[in-house]
Amino acid sequence: RWMSAWAKRSSDWGQNLLALGDFNIDRKDDLLWQACTSTGLSVPADLETVPRTIFSNPSKPSLDKFYDQIAWFSSTTTGLPRLSLEYIRGGGFDFMPYIYKDTTLTKSSISFRMSDHYPLWAEFALA
């Protein structure tokens, strides 16, 4: 409730609202995805094809394990202020080749030592 009320205050100085984090969305278009996007939040198209975890299928990253998101309000039909920042691009970071260089650990074993989620990033233009 608080976030919804805050997002509707378009006269506030901080009206750019980005939703970031682990939403536990199993795959695009599942019920949690629909609940998230039905609020007016949208994820940029180029982030929809980024693998989210070490368990994602690299050839079909948008089909499952769609847990982490970077989203914002982009529609004027919701009555919420649109993001005033210009989105440039986004992606993910596969840390596996840098953290686990010479190891025989399984992906399951790695997930207990470090997060199995790849960090997402978004780049915006300077005003």
Stretches found by the model and what they are:
Residues 1:
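Metal-dependent phosphoester/phosphodiester hydrolase catalytic core
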Residues 4-18, 24-127:
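Metal-dependent phosphoester-hydrolase catalytic domains
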